[in-house]
Amino acid sequence: MSLLTEVETPIRNEWGCRCNDSSDPLVVAASIIGILHLILWILDRLFFKCIYRLFKHGLKRGPSTEGVPESMREEYRKEQQNAVDADDSHFVSIELE
């Protein structure tokens, strides 16, 4: 006998649930959470390229350069690159006794 026939049985020409605890608040909350989880999972699978591209490129953006002259933007880029280059040459040697 399948699980479907054990849970749902025809009652007066309609399909109903034999479960008497379906009005229990915990069962209702679990059902709502399950449905929301399913909806979010479907949306994630449908739009994952858009969502993760937004996070990937959106979170890596630097400070806004709107209204800043191009010469100052170039100077800022050079300072950032110099800071990265300077960090590459510093190493810490730790000796354990």
Curated annotation (Swiss-Prot):
Species this chain originates from: Influenza A virus (strain A/Hong Kong/5/1983 H3N2)
Membrane topology: Single-pass type III membrane protein
Note in the entry: When the channel is activated, one or more imidazole moieties of His-37 probably become bi-protonated.
Record Gene3D superfamilies: 6.10.250.1640
Regulation of its activity: The M2 protein from most influenza A strains is inhibited by amantadine and rimantadine, resulting in viral uncoating incapacity. Emergence of amantadine-resistant variants is usually rapid.
Site (Seems to be involved in pH gating): 41
Residues anchoring lipid (S-palmitoyl cysteine): 50
Ranges per topology, Virion surface: 1-22
Gene Ontology biological process: protein complex oligomerization; symbiont genome entry into host cell via pore formation in plasma membrane; symbiont-mediated suppression of host autophagy
Predominant cellular place of this UniProt entry's protein: virion
Keyword Transmembrane: yes
GO cellular component, one term: membrane
Ranges per topology, Intravirion: 44-97
Protein name as catalogued: Matrix protein 2
Sequence segments annotated as region (Disordered): 59-88
Record note on domains: Cytoplasmic tail plays an important role in virion assembly and morphogenesis.
InterPro entries to which the protein is assigned, alphabetical: Flu_M2
